[in-house]
Each structure stands twice: as structure tokens, then as C-alpha cells.
Curated annotation (Swiss-Prot):
Name of this chain's protein: C-C motif chemokine 3
Keyword GTP-binding: no
Family as reported in the entry's similarity comment: Belongs to the intercrine beta (chemokine CC) family.
Top-level taxon in the UniProt lineage: Eukaryota
Disulfide bonds: 33-57, 34-73
One term of GO molecular function: chemoattractant activity
Cellular-component GO terms for this entry: cytoplasm; cytosol; extracellular space
UniProt xrefs under SUPFAM superfamilies: Interleukin 8-like chemokines
The gene coding this protein: CCL3
Length: 92
């Protein structure tokens, strides 16, 4: 007995949607996590924005975005990182 292609496609789509809905993280899966930090301080003039990584990430981190749109992970416990974050919050 052959299963029509359309029925098989519907079944596969349904299964993929269910796996998203019943996933332990669901739609709240973090977008960006830090697995390592930059080893040197990034010059402040290159930084335009920052955000904190999700609490679901294995390592805490601050992700800085540069003028060229690049992202770099920094250790939130370092003094220069805290200064940059405070400065960016004041300018927001």
C-alpha cells in the first residue's frame, strides 16, 4: 500500500510542529549564547550596542555589537565590560 505524497508531507509537517511545541525550551530557546570571551578589551569607539545573554545559556555574557555589525562576547564580571554597559544604558 502506497501513502500519497501529500499525506506524507502533512504528516511530516505536523510532526515537526509538535516537536517545536513540546520541546523543553519551546519558543524561548536563546538566540545568542557566549561560549568564550574576547581576550582583549574592545576600543569603546567601536561599540554601538550591547545585550545580555539569556539565563538559559551555560555561561553568562554581554554581547557587544560594533559599528560594522559584528558581535563579540565579553565577560560581564570584567570592569571594562561593566563600564561600557553602564555608558550604553545612559546613552539609550
Amino acid at each position: 500500500m502506497k501513502v500519497p505524497g501529500a499525506a506524507l508531507a502533512v504528516l511530516l509537517c505536523t510532526m515537526s510542529l509538535c516537536s517545536q511545541v513540546f520541546s523543553p525550551f519551546g519558543a524561548d530557546t536563546p538566540i545568542a549564547c557566549c561560549f568564550s570571551y574576547v581576550s582583549k578589551q574592545i576600543p569603546r569607539k567601536f561599540i554601538v550596542d550591547c545585550f545580555e545573554t539569556s539565563s538559559q545559556c551555560s555561561k553568562p555574557g554581554i554581547i557587544f555589537e560594533t559599528r560594522k555589525g559584528r558581535q563579540a562576547c565579553a565577560n560581564p564580571s570584567e570592569a571594562w565590560v561593566q563600564e561600557y554597559v553602564a555608558d550604553l544604558k545612559l546613552k539609550a
